[in-house]
A protein has these predicted regions:
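Bacterial N-terminal signal peptides
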Residues: 11-20
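Signature of long, low-cysteine stretches enriched in small and polar/charged residues
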Residues: 138-189
Length: 229
């Protein structure tokens, strides 16, 4: 089984993952913020907060702004903080050069039903410093997905753990470019000596690829990902 290894830390200035974590559609993954964003344009450059999806549900970004918390995006290979090992499920591949600059890792399904719109799983990591309450991060984790156009939850969302660290997961359907899509995001809080690290993994695909995403996330990523602080 293939494995993606990320050694995460600080040192990169704050820039605009949740999915999300994910790109929606053919190599077009765009997040408005390192901490929570979903999708709209095909760009590998760091996006800005102005593109963040607005809505009635409070988000992690709202919490960060209201409490003047400093957010630092983390990239794979940065020395000095948690080591995160993501297993690449069978039938999936590392996204390679199509991985956005703001993501720490991404993977894509090899045999999609629609070749130019394959299922994707994208991970982002960021560090928060200041008056940060991990419980609040998990409380507001579902906000951005709930603000997506036409979002209909497949579950009520649930608290869980990933590699022993507290997490929150939510999945549902939403509309983009007139097409029904499925999206799921797991947000994980990882306490560190110099701040709170947050991992967000977002899976996104056309709605009829739900089974593909479920197979990858529940049978491989959720059970085989390891985090070493």
């Amino acid at each position: 089984m293939k494995k993606l290894t990320a050694v995460t830390t600080v040192g990169i200035t704050a820039v605009a993952l949740s999915l999300a974590l994910v790109g929606c559609g053919s190599n077009t993954k765009t997040e408005t913020n390192a901490s929570t964003s979903i999708t709209t344009t095909a760009s590998k450059a760091a996006p800005t907060t102005s593109a963040e999806a607005a809505g009635p549900n409070k988000t992690i970004q709202d919490y960060i702004r209201e409490n003047q918390i400093v957010e630092t995006p983390i990239h794979r290979g940065d020395p000095g903080s948690p080591t995160i090992d993501l297993q690449v499920p069978p039938g999936w591949s590392d996204a390679g050069p199509s991985t956005p600059d703001w993501a720490y890792d991404a993977m894509v399904y090899d045999q999609p039903k629609v070749p130019d719109d394959p299922p994707r799983i994208t991970a982002i990591v960021f560090k928060l410093t200041g008056n940060v309450d991990p419980a609040k991060i998990l409380e507001y984790a579902p906000g951005e997905l709930k603000n997506l156009p036409g979002f209909e939850p497949l579950t009520n969302g649930n608290r869980s753990t990933l590699s022993g660290f507290d997490a929150f997961s939510l999945s549902g359907n939403y509309m983009k470019d007139g097409k029904k899509r499925v999206i799921g995001r797991k947000t994980v809080v990882i306490p560190g000596q110099d701040g709170l690290y947050v991992l967000q993994m977002t899976a996104d695909a056309l709605a009829d690829e739900l089974g593909t995403l479920m197979e990858a996330t529940t049978k491989v990523i959720d059970v085989q990902t390891t985090i070493t602080p």
